[in-house]
A protein has these predicted regions:
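Structural marker of alpha-solenoid helical repeat scaffolds
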Residues: 421, 455, 489, 523, ...
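Terminal, low-structured helical/coil segments at or just beyond the last alpha-helical repeat
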Residues: 578-583, 591-594, 598-601, 613-617, ...
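Conserved alpha-helical positions within TPR/SEL1-like repeat arrays
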Residues: 426-437, 461-472, 495-506, 529-540, ...
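Polytopic membrane enzymes that build or remodel cell-surface glycoconjugates and lipids
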Residues: 2-468, 495, 533
Length: 661
């Protein structure tokens, strides 16, 4: 099927000046139309705010400098996943438009459009019918919404662009055997691997294409030039698997499958993706997680049916190689996510729409070519409506994508929609609870955390978040119970040790608080918040020198840490052990006050105490009165009462001392 004499684009366009000009105008018009339709299909996501792990993928504050850019490349673990080129692009985007979400979304959409346009060129060079239809389906198919509308999946759209660029250059090398296009293809492949290593399957995909074109493979012509691609892809894949396991966390009970069970997963995954590609309804951000067991007989039906399909296609390949080639491309490109390798999202579900971003091309191309051939043959039931079939199909897919991309408007909508479509998604309940917790809707948050624990009682995250909600609600004892249960599941959970330290600090159990803060530092030695809180506890215990040292360590880690700066100023201003440092206390308090715009009554309270320690009682009284008035305006009654006491001392030219001093 499709076995025709090869001709490149230049040969085709030189067949006649009128035809070349007409072809050129038609291509530009179709390109513009494809971009416009794709932009409109993703319109609801244009201003979508960051969701789920976007904050972990977007450039962290500590990586936004040139030094941070260097760490992106040289320090695995500095970013959530080691994809340095993708994170470099995030870094550049942050320099250009900061936290403006539309910039990130529009770039991903345009990268996706560029890939679709490159796909047209590739299919034309391979002389596969329906190139524009295949590109349009790829561009607006709703299965791609997760890759395009989710900021983090710039990894997919960027690596996809390099994937297509590499294939296009390699096809030119295959025709000319010149070194230049080969070098370009290899360079694009390397760039793609540094964006997302899922494209490591590219050399196998190229061999499938060559087998489809020629009916056989030659070691010297076809395989040998791809050896560097295989070596680089394998090395990148092994490294990524190590990162997923050791740095991202793709290990533990959720990943304990036998080899037989992994084959069962693979068979089911392939049919699942094929089904969603053909019938793209009820797409979910987190699909139900299957219970896979090698003792359940019906789970063997999936790999068995796949094997039978391949046998049929192999027999048909004696006359028509295209169907087998398309299915093999689909399966091979899916290989990294078929279950044989551990990837972190498997913790929540064994399937995800963005996993088949590139693999979908195997089926899309078959469908588009089939439609194009039917139109060309002019069958009686096709002729009356001609290309309206194609227009209707693309329009329908674009509408579905428009609806699907609306799910990515904001994080709350994402989790609510996920729960509506998959009520048993414990992760969605947990994450929606986190959103509600941040909004101060504690009762609603607690409901979702408890629902998450009903579904998955052994997950430490939901248990820890329930503890945090209870702590904010004032139920300190029950919060401590939940935190301890979380630690039973995950003993080295640094965040929970930190939260437990805070809970014990509220209860006045200072030794317990110190123990948990120190446990946190074992896992997170550069956590400025922990050093600050340790300083608070030590100061309450009268260990002023130790407290000051911990505040200074917090500021060393994060010089913009206002609270640590204020706490250090308070320790210096209210301790009789530090009279010679009163000027330092004033300077620190002034800096903290400037950083908060002079609108924080607690910071002004510290500045007043620093002035008093320095003997500047008139400034202390003036600043104390400003602080008192702000506290009254902000309904901070306890702070206002404390300030009345302190002002009474300043009026007598007496500096304030904390009770334990």
């Amino acid at each position: 099927l499709y076995q025709k004499k090869e001709m490149d684009d230049s040969t085709r366009y030189k067949s006649g000046s009128d035809h070349s000009a007409g072809q050129w105008r038609r291509d530009w018009l179709l390109s513009l139309l494809l971009v416009i339709v794709t932009l409109l299909a993703y319109l609801p996501a244009w201003n979508g705010t960051p969701i789920w792990d976007d904050d972990a993928h977007l450039t962290k504050a500590e990586l936004r400098s040139l030094e941070g850019l260097g760490r992106i490349w040289t320090q695995p673990g500095a970013t959530q996943q080691y994809y340095p080129l993708a994170h470099t692009l995030f870094w550049v985007e942050h320099q250009l438009w900061g936290d403006w979400p539309a910039g990130y979304h529009l770039l991903s959409i345009l990268l996706h459009c560029a890939s679709a346009l490159l796909l047209v060129r590739i299919l034309r060079q391979l002389q596969i019918p329906g190139a524009w239809l295949a590109a349009a389906i790829f561009a607006v198919h709703p299965i791609q919404a997760e890759s395009v509308a989710w900021i983090s999946e710039l990894k997919n759209t960027l690596s996809g662009l390099f994937y297509f660029g590499s294939v296009l250059a390699y096809l030119k090398f295959d025709r000319t055997r010149n070194r230049a296009p080969y070098t370009v293809a290899l360079a694009f492949f390397i760039c793609g691997l540094m964006s997302k290593t899922v494209i490591a399957t590219l050399p196998v995909a190229i061999l499938i294409i060559f087998w489809w074109k020629r009916g056989k493979l030659s070691w010297k012509r076809d395989v040998w030039p791809l050896i560097p691609f295989f070596l680089l892809g394998t090395a990148a894949g092994v490294f990524t698997a190590w990162v997923e396991r050791n740095l991202v966390g793709a290990q533990g009970a959720d990943f304990n499958y036998t080899l037989t069970e992994r084959f069962l997963i693979a068979g089911r995954v392939i049919w699942f993706y094929l089904g969603k590609l053909i019938w793209p309804l009820d797409l979910i951000f987190v699909y139900p997680r299957w219970r896979v067991s090698q003792t359940v007989w019906w789970q063997y039906l999936y790999p068995t049916a796949l094997l039978l399909l391949l046998i049929v296609l192999i027999r048909l390949s004696r006359r028509w190689r295209a169907p087998l080639a398309g299915v093999l491309f689909f399966i091979v490109t899916l290989f990294p996510v078929l279950g044989f390798l551990n990837v972190y999202p498997f913790r929540y579900s064994l399937v995800a729409d963005h996993f088949q971003y590139l693999a979908s091309l195997g089926i899309i191309t078959l469908v588009a070519a089939g439609i194009a051939l039917l139109l060309k043959l002019g069958l009686h039931w096709v002729r009356p409506i001609d290309y309206l079939w194609c227009l209707a199909l693309v329009t329908l897919l674009a509408i579905l994508t428009w609806r699907q991309s609306a799910m990515y408007t904001n994080i709350e909508t994402l989790w609510q929609t996920t729960i509506e479509r998959n009520p048993q998604a414990w992760m969605a309940h947990n994450n929606l609870g986190t959103v509600l917790l941040q909004k101060g809707q504690l009762d609603e948050a607690i409901i979702h955390f408890r629902k998450a624990l009903e579904i998955a009682a052994d997950h430490a995250d939901a248990r820890a978040n329930l503890g945090s909600a209870l702590l904010q609600k004032g139920d300190v004892d029950e919060a401590i119970v939940q935190y301890n249960k979380a630690l039973e599941i995950k003993p080295d959970y640094a965040d929970v040790h930190y939260d437990l330290g805070n809970a014990f600090l509220l209860k006045g159990q200072l030794d317990e608080a110190i123990a948990h803060y120190k446990k946190t530092l074992e896992s997170e030695p550069a956590n400025a918040d922990v050093y600050n809180n340790l300083g608070l506890v030590l100061f309450q215990q009268g260990e002023v020198g130790e407290a000051i040292a911990h505040y200074q360590k917090a500021l060393e880690i994060n010089p913009q840490f206002v609270q640590a700066r204020a706490n250090l100023a308070w320790a210096l201003a209210t301790s009789p052990q530090t009279p010679l440092l009163s000027a330092v206390a004033v300077k620190l308090a002034q800096q903290a006050n400037q950083m908060t715009g002079g609108a924080n009554p607690a910071i002004l309270q510290i500045l007043a105490a620093a002035y008093a320690q320095n003997g500047k009682f008139s400034e202390a009284i003036e600043t104390g009165h400003r602080s008192w008035q702000l506290a009254i305006d902000q309904n901070k009654t306890a702070l206002a009462e404390a300030l009345r006491t302190e002002l009474g001392l300043y009026e007598k030219n007496i500096p304030y001392r904390v009770n334990n001093q």
